[in-house]
Design a protein with these regions (language model features):
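An N-terminal assembly and electron-transfer interface module characteristic of large anaerobic redox
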Residues: 1-426
Length: 426
């Protein structure tokens, strides 16, 4: 991990590998996470996960290592932490993850846990920030759980959805929408690891006939490992955004799977889209088309690329659409004029902000704050975390057909806000 990436994750985004691992483990009901490290790392990881997963404050705990632990080892700290979890009496399994510093000590964490002899299985791994950012930590935790899977008899017409996370912005709602779409097409969803699936459901994952990867940075390593171990084919399909984009996503998935039927389901969604777009046409007759001088989309790859494509192909007109990706991807977006990778092209990204004139920003609070500090005009709504100045309380997703309605609504409200600002300035 480069110095730039480490400083970005540890000091600004609060989303290092430790956080990613904790997010995956804590998403499994009945699981407790023991972070073997100082309270600093624990509070940052726990708070980030707890913002979206209400169990985190109860199921993530910490050994609270001291400087002397770096000299004498962390055995006593681990034993105390396991004792607290045992006394709570709610754990079904425990995951122990080392932070950066304790991972360098070389303690036999697995041996210490086995010697403790708790009433539940214990799984161990190193996952500090030096091991990577959130995505790497999440993916490594997923792989650790794949190690526990056993061969299962294949269930025809079934899939796992890999790469979902309930700590992404609207992550839980997106997971529910993906399950709704697939089940509406007659596809049996075995598991969605990282997004609400139980341990039993995840252990049944090898019975799926196919793995659909919706976020490469989170799910692709596990998909490759499951193909190797259980001969389950996989495909990277991204997340669906927009009305037309979601329809094309369904058709693409069914073509890949060669099972499922979508005609009836898509007919119902077409009616939903027609009614929503009718309302948009009414606004357009009053205020004109959805035009923005510039558009900036900054988010993880699946969100950024999918939403950018839906924006330009379905809803808005703009002179320039720029994407800032928060992690690497092999995918691209024909609708974008410029695509940059955060931490790899920071000088170009700095110039993008300095040269910004006005327009629509779809991002997290980090990007909008940066524009505010430069006194740049813009309208915005958030599609990624952190979101410090915008609340999300409804059960609507950002992805899929139901998510398209929310995005279209927010785009129109942003345009109306921009029109109101222009009238005030005149």
């Amino acid at each position: 991990m480069s110095k730039c990436e480490f400083e970005s994750s540890c000091h600004h985004n609060d989303t290092c590998g430790l956080t990613g691992s904790a997010a995956f483990f804590a998403s499994i009901p009945g699981s407790f996470v023991l972070i073997n490290g100082p309270l600093w790392c624990y509070f940052y990881a726990m708070k980030y996960v707890d913002d979206e997963n209400g169990r985190a404050a109860r199921c993530i705990t910490c050994t609270g290592t001291s400087p002397s632990s770096m000299v004498y080892g962390t055995e006593k700290d681990i034993l105390k932490g396991l004792s607290r979890i045992r006394d709570a009496g709610q754990a079904e399994r425990v995951f122990i993850e080392n932070n950066c510093s304790t991972g360098l000590i070389g303690d036999d964490v697995k041996g210490i846990a086995e010697a403790f002899g708790g009433p539940w299985p214990v799984y161990t791994m190193d996952s500090g920030g030096l091991k990577g950012r959130f995505e790497e930590g999440f993916a490594r935790a997923f792989l650790r759980v794949v190690e526990e899977m056993k061969e299962e008899k294949t269930i025809p017409g079934s899939v796992n959805v890999l790469g979902l996370s309930d700590v992404y912005l609207k992550g839980r709602e997106d997971g529910e929408e993906i399950r709704r779409i697939l089940r509406g097409c007659g596809i049996n969803v075995i598991s969605t690891p990282g997004c609400g699936s139980s341990w039993e459901e995840i252990m049944k994952a090898p019975s799926a006939a196919f793995n659909l990867v919706v976020r490469d940075e989170l799910g692709l390593p596990a998909a490759r490992e499951m193909e190797k171990r259980f001969h389950i084919p996989y495909a990277s399909v991204g997340l669906p955004y927009g009305f037309e984009g979601s329809r094309k996503w369904v058709e693409k998935v069914l073509e890949i799977l060669a099972f499922g039927k979508a005609d009836s389901f898509l007919d119902k969604e077409k009616e939903r889209a027609r009614e929503i777009l009718r309302k948009g046409n009414g606004l357009e007759s009053l205020w004109g088309s959805l035009w923005f001088d510039e558009v900036l989309v900054a988010a993880p790859p699946s969100e950024a690329l999918g939403i950018a494509e839906a924006l330009r192909s379905e809803w808005i007109d703009t002179a320039k659409l720029t994407i800032h990706l928060l992690s690497p991807t092999d995918r691209t977006c024909q609708a974008a004029d410029i695509i940059r990778l955060v931490t790899a092209e920071d000088e170009d990204i700095r110039r993008d902000y300095e040269n910004w004139k006005d327009g629509l920003v779809l991002s997290s609070s980090h990007e909008t704050t940066r524009l505010e500090r430069l006194h740049k005009p813009f309208v915005s709504f958030h599609i990624a975390r952190p979101s410090y100045d915008e609340g999300f309380f409804s059960d609507l997703p950002l992805s899929g057909f139901r998510g398209a309605a929310l995005l279209y609504e927010k785009i129109w409200n942003a345009r109306l806000k921009e029109i109101g600002r222009e009238k005030i300035l005149k």
